[in-house]
Amino acid sequence: MIRSSKERLLWAQFDALQLGSGWDEEDIEKPQILVEDVFGDSHPGSVHLNQVSEQVAYGIYEKGGKPGHFHVTDICDGCAQGHDGMNLILASREVICDMVEMHAGYVPWDGMVLSSSCDKSIPAHLKAMARVNIPAVFVPGGSMRPGPNQTTSLVAGDISLRQKRKDAITPAEIRNYKRTGCPSVGACTFMGTASTMQCMAEALGLALPGSALVPATMSELQFFARRAGRTIMELVRRNIRPIDILTPQAFRNAIIVHSAIGGSTNGLIHLPAIAKELGMELDPELFNEINPKIPHIGNINPSGKHLTESFWFAGGI
């Protein structure tokens, strides 16, 4: 008997409350899957995630499950630059992780699918998956499309500010950077923390192969989301949990990938935090041990030339 059905036998009010939320009697007999994202108007990496979760739900329905939707909006490192908002950014990782734990624990879900795109929400979700330890799949929210001349939000922010201080840029040029720096939804299109952590989710085995850094406006993102919905039902059936996937070798593999793609140094903060949720110690010296042995083959901005969607088109992780 699945976990949710066992608990339902103990407390009739549980069924009554779900029926009052729009579920029917057939729904409450099915495997119940938490579908949680960080959808909101906070930044381009999250504004489309409700559509991703809808596709996840379709996949769950296809395989005989019942999804339940929850949202905890994240905040953006870029929006927090240059003022006291930056003091809140790392703390938001813990808040999001804690909220997922609460949502996943207050009813006996049989599995969960989490979706996010960016710097602190992805490690928050990966930490939560490890902490809650029920069958789980992560769906990365994909990459933003590049602007004209490969413009990125990094150009619009950091580079234009430096040029302005040197009086080497006109107001019209700054305006152009602003208007072309973020031309679509998705994570910023360079190998910052957001793109790095999408890659780490896939390298760890918590996201489907090929799903990190999908161009966020392409239908492929919807296909991966629907496939994740189907996959979680198989994981529930086989009771495969994050603790079965997040082995010491999985973390070592992630560090190897991190080195090869020139990943953000924030990986040194987030990967050990994920491991700690499982009682593992991920010594920072392991990064020092692995990095000199792994060639930097990912020619990806800012340590290389190309933007993240080019990396995905070339084969990705």
Question: Regions from the language model: what does each represent?
Answer:
Residues M1-K30:
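N-terminal amphipathic/basic leader segments beginning at the initiator methionine
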Residues M1-S4, D27-I28, G64-V72, P171-Y177, ...:
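Flexible, glycine/charged-enriched surface loops at secondary-structure junctions
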Residues W11, E29, S46, N50, ...:
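Conserved structured core elements
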Residues A16-G22, P183-A187, A254-V257, G304-L307:
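Glycine-rich, charged/polar anion/phosphate-binding loops
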Residues E25-P140:
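Long, structured ligand/cofactor-binding scaffold of large enzymes
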Residues I33-V35, D119, M200, T265, ...:
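Buried hydrophobic positions in well-ordered alpha/beta secondary-structure cores of metabolic enzymes
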Residues V52, Y61-K63, D74, P140-P146, ...:
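Terminal amphipathic helices with adjacent charged low-complexity linkers/tails
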Residues I89-N253, H258, G263:
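Active-site cavity-forming subdomains of large catalytic enzyme subunits
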